[in-house]
Regions:
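Short intrinsically disordered, low-complexity coil segments enriched in acidic
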Residues: 2, 16-19
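Mature catalytic domains of secreted/periplasmic carbohydrate-active enzymes
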Residues: 21-448
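Residue-level detector of intrinsically disordered terminal segments
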Residues: 4-5, 33
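Bacterial N-terminal signal peptides
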Residues: 6-16
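Positively charged n-region of N-terminal signal peptides that target proteins for export
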Residues: 1-4, 157
């Protein structure tokens, strides 16, 4: 690791001194199969439904029994306050690692490899082939982090002064990094064929360091829309990319039995602004409801929630983290565009009730990214610096030292990263620093 960043880390450390059933406290829940959907209509031809007239759906999804009900009111009333260990922990490592690193194209490789003219698209052509023939599913199959050694990495991070780890559970690519009950596209069945989250958990517990799991799959249903495109010019013009494949198309192929819809989702490009947003640098579609896909939307929200509950069941994390830009996932606007439901409240209530059962107290927290701070949730500040000191709440700032996923020769200067660390800690925040791992699971030499 770069010696200057390591020194900064040490200083901060010193400052700190379906597929099966879910069992929830005696309640069995069987997630049904993905609902069928109509044939896609013409692109950009369907207006989004109104979020003003669409009432938030209360999901029929059981949670672990306990004092926490799946409402913000109950969560805020029962939560005992942010644990002191977060207040005392000013530096942590953000482990933003997964198969997208295999593209060596930085963040969002899985989406950008389907956008003509992007570096990710060109890199994919060179290293794998055309996305109509060799898509992201083949990246998953071939990804082999053979040098991934979580024990050695955790020791490095702890020596650098990290007090807890932020570990990516699933990114927007929908690939679960654990032995997932509900997602067959996972790291125990494809690629490394290892329970990567389980390995991180064991290493963290052995080192006596806390950890949390992050989940970025809520808005994957519109994020993945580039996989339903095709080239607009050249020899492959009009040939659909592999997001258009079906379960039946896999017969006799290596991915037989794996449904591409559980990876890429369904084609939603008929809704206004969805295709445009998919090809933008960042912008989500306009606020609204995917009103022609309400049965699928409800199923999708349950699938999202159950995968998080599954990871909590298996690994007993010290916090959970959901990505997004609005006040909660599935809000109907921002990254939560498409549906409105109480999936987030159910996940948090289940997490806190489970923790109470296991530990006898709730010494954990939930990050709902960019949610206005409320009792029961913690918010974050990605790469920004608040104007004022924020002593009224525990909060976390996060920044990568290069791109979020590995990209060669993309590194911020040491003094810029250290300056960021100091600015955040001076404002009473904690800092999560992402140091991207190489595709093989090793640290780049410049970070050692």
């Amino acid at each position: 690791m770069n010696q200057f960043i390591m020194l900064g880390c040490l200083w901060l450390g010193a400052c700190a001194t379906a597929f099966s059933q879910q069992q929830t406290n005696g309640v069995n829940y069987q997630l049904g199969p993905m609902p069928s959907v109509h044939k896609p209509l013409a692109e950009n031809s369907v207006p989004m439904g109104s979020i003003q007239t669409f009432e938030e759906v209360k999901l029929d999804l059981p949670i672990t029994s306990g004092p926490y009900e799946p409402t913000w009111k109950s969560i805020e009333a029962n939560y005992p306050g942010t644990p002191e260990w977060l207040r005392d922990s000013k530096f942590e490592i953000w482990i933003h690692f997964g198969p997208q690193s295999a593209g060596e194209s930085g963040d969002w490789y899985a989406r950008k490899m389907y956008v003509e003219g992007t570096p990710a698209y060109e890199n994919h052509l060179k290293n794998y082939g055309h996305p109509s023939e060799v898509g992201y599913k083949e990246v998953l199959r071939d990804w082999n982090p053979k040098k991934f050694n979580p024990k050695a990495l955790v020791d490095i991070y702890k020596d650098a002064g990290a007090r807890f780890l932020i570990i990516q559970g699933v990114h927007h690519d929908q690939f679960d990094m654990w032995d997932s009950k509900y997602q067959p596209w996972n790291s125990t069945r494809l690629g490394p064929k290892r329970d990567l989250i389980g390995e991180w958990e064991k290493a963290a517990r052995k080192a006596g360091i806390r950890f949390g799991l992050t989940f970025h799959h809520e808005y994957s249903w519109w994020w993945w829309q580039t996989a339903f495109q095709s080239d607009t010019k050249g020899d492959k013009k009009g040939v659909p990319y592999d997001g258009n494949l079906t379960l039946a198309d896999g017969k006799g192929k290596w991915w037989e039995g794996l449904d591409p819809k559980y990876l890429y989702g369904i084609n939603l490009r008929e809704y206004e602004t969805v295709a445009e947003a998919a090809n933008s640098r960042w912008s989500p579609p306009q606020a609204g409801i995917f009103s022609g896909h309400l049965e699928y939307a409800e199923w999708y929200a349950k699938w999202w929630a159950l995968r998080m509950m599954d990871a909590v069941d298996k690994y007993n994390p010290d916090f959970i983290y959901t990505d997004g830009t609005d006040q909660q996932p599935f809000s109907g606007s921002g990254t939560g565009t498409g549906y409105k439901c109480d999936a987030m409240q159910r996940v948090i209530a289940d997490f806190y009730n489970k923790t109470m059962d296991r530990r006898g107290k709730v010494d954990v927290f939930s990050i709902v990214k960019f949610r206005k701070q409320t009792n029961g949730t913690v918010n974050t500040c990605e790469t920004g610096i608040p104007e004022n000191i924020k002593t009224d709440q525990a909060w976390i700032a996060e920044t990568p030292v290069g791109d979020w996923f590995y990209g060669p020769n993309f590194v911020y200067s040491s003094d810029a990263v250290i300056r960021y660390l100091l600015e955040i800690v001076a404002r009473d925040g904690a800092v999560g620093v992402s140091i991207p791992l190489r595709p093989d699971g090793s640290l780049d030499e410049c970070w050692r």
